[in-house]
Swiss-Prot record:
The splicing pattern of the pre-mRNA is regulated in a tissue-specific manner and by development, and changes in response to various types of abiotic stresses. GO terms for biological process: mRNA splicing, via spliceosome; RNA splicing. It comes from Arabidopsis thaliana. This is Serine/arginine-rich splicing factor SC35. Residues 294-303 have a biased composition (Polar residues).
Amino acid sequence: MSHFGRSGPPDISDTYSLLVLNITFRTTADDLYPLFAKYGKVVDVFIPRDRRTGDSRGFAFVRYKYKDEAHKAVERLDGRVVDGREITVQFAKYGPNAEKISKGRVVEPPPKSRRSRSRSPRRSRSPRRSRSPPRRRSPRRSRSPRRRSRDDYREKDYRKRSRSRSYDRRERHEEKDRDHRRRTRSRSASPDEKRRVRGRYDNESRSHSRSLSASPARRSPRSSSPQKTSPAREVSPDKRSNERSPSPRRSLSPRSPALQKASPSKEMSPERRSNERSPSPGSPAPLRKVDAASRSQSPYAAE
């Protein structure tokens, strides 16, 4: 509410503003204007009000045209009682340096020195530094390494899979080459191997047949084979015939016992008997002589 009413706000450029604090809710601009006009030309008196209730907020602004007049008003009116309250008058501040007013009084912030001293340990524990770890643990920053780690793991898995696949392909290719080489070797070496196998089989069959042919001769000495017979038996076929067919003298000896006693052929030496039983290839002549003598002594020859 301004003292000049509906005429609108006056031109406050190049003016000096005073702040009046601790006024009552009943005090109006008309009540303050004659009080401050005593010390100079007042340009404007303004009391801020609440927009909801319309009540006074407990302070007012008084503007002077000249600076020296404003200083006089501050010196004379500061601490005066108006409507039962002691008011405070001072130069108003605007912008970042403006005072914070609450219930008609300026809320003075703590001095800067105290702030610096009080906040010095806090600065060591400043919110930036205290909040730095949670910022590092923020979802964006925390997700970025996780995503990178996942990407890294995916790349590592892909590399491992690609390496394993390439290794499997190499192994398969090597196995195919080995199988192909084995097949080519088996095909190229098959006739030689067949010949070797056949030669071994023939040798084994021959040795087996020889062992079978030689085994009965060793087991039964009675069955004489033509290879193991003595050369005397093979060379003298006449002796075989003589042994098989006995002489007429021997055949007649049992019939005529008297002749057997008179014949000197039976009284032969053991050497002749051995010669007769085992004839040698160089003994046909004495056998013939013996036969002639026996024939001359026999009674059939005398007749």
